[in-house]
């Protein structure tokens, strides 16, 4: 074997080991896992007693779905624009850390003839928004680090929740969202636009 081939194989092995090590390190400290034939296998945590899964969950029909948007920087405004044209939807609240972003979305709503939505902003704006009883769905389009806390707050306040990807930053947060969805019997949906291609299903 020539030197070039040996170095290529050694470099590939180093990358593979580094990748699996990084995967293991990205798991939260409380996540239990083990190695099995060169693969990281994550153990399913103990499920709360009596809690039912939400596979096939059907919520009561809502005549007009009252939607709130949290995160209006990149994907959020496009989502607001699309929802403005969906029958049976009422946008009732807009929230972003920067007030101007929410006001810009409000401007688009006005332009297409929709009634104004309430505006929330700042670090804790989403918490106030989630306390409202007149919101059915919270659409989360914040930066990645805030997807989980906003979705958690929405579920804890009895709202259906739709989250741009990634929905969480570690497996512990994923299980927290699953548990909240099961406990509250509210939908928690990951807004992935490519689910059934070969790459996703293999």
Q: What would you call each of these model-derived segments?
A:
Residues 168-202:
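A contiguous active-site-proximal alpha/beta segment in oxidoreductase catalytic domains
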Residues 158-160, 164-166:
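Short helix/strand-capping hinge loops at secondary-structure junctions
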Residues 141, 164, 189-191:
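A cross-family glycoside hydrolase active-site/sugar-binding cleft signature
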Residues 3, 11-14, 22-159, 175, ...:
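N-terminal glycine-/serine-/threonine-rich beta1-alpha1-beta2 phosphate-ribose binding loop
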């Amino acid at each position: 074997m020539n030197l070039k081939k040996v170095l290529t194989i050694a470099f590939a092995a180093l990358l593979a080991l580094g990748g699996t090590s990084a995967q293991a390190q990205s798991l939260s400290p409380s996540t239990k896992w083990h190695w099995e034939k060169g693969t990281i296998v994550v153990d399913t945590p103990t499920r709360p007693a009596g809690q039912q899964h939400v596979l096939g969950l059907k919520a009561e029909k809502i005549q007009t779905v009252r939607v709130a948007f949290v995160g209006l920087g990149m994907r959020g405004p496009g989502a607001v624009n699309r929802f403005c044209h969906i029958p049976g939807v009422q946008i009732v609240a807009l929230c972003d850390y920067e007030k101007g972003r929410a006001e810009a979305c409000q401007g688009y709503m006005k332009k297409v003839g929709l009634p104004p939505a309430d505006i929330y902003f700042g670090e804790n704006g989403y918490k106030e928004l989630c306390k409202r009883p007149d919101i059915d769905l919270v659409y989360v389009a914040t930066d990645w680090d805030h997807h989980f806390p906003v979705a958690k707050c929405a579920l804890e306040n009895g709202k259906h929740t739709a989250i741009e990807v990634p929905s969480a930053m570690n497996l512990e947060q994923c299980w927290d969202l699953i548990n909240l969805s099961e406990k509250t019997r509210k939908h928690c949906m990951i807004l992935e636009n490519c689910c059934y291609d070969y790459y996703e299903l293999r």
